[in-house]
Amino acid sequence: MRKLLLLSALTLLIVSCKSTSATNTKVDNTKERLMRGEWVISSVSYVGSEYIKVQSFGLADSQCFQGSTWKLVANNNKGEMSLTKSDCMSFSSPITWFVNKDGQFVLKVLNAGEKAKKVRDGYVLDVANQTETSFQLIDMINVGGKSTNVVYQFQKN
């Protein structure tokens, strides 16, 4: 009997200590509703540094995202992003996205015709300073052993 109780307590302890993934948490509908619509990234900045060469979302230099357009549809968590800066490669892609209860923006960049469940890689960014006309996405990166934030400033289009 004692062994059974000990085994049950140990099992309960192991199950209760399991961490949750950023992509498996519940959705924050309030933040998502504020994000729906068409947006433009008005600036990309680096907290504590003037300029760092960063490849954002595995696509292009972070400065190429300045002026990019993002269409976010909240009712089905789909959308589209387009890089439009003249001195950078042009790129357009469907995306899936949502905001979890921790206030994190979860993003997957898809290839044309590709389903989100087939894409294994994605990005988790913090949401900050959200209003009806602007918000920030903050990506924490490691540069030379130090954590640095890349801040994408979105403005309603």
How would you name each of these model-derived features?
Residues 17-93, 101-157:
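Lipid interaction determinants
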Residues 4-13:
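Sec-dependent N-terminal signal peptides
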Residues 1-4, 18-19:
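Positively charged n-region of N-terminal signal peptides that target proteins for export
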Residues 97:
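Single-stranded nucleic-acid nicking/binding segments centered on His-rich, glycine/basic loops
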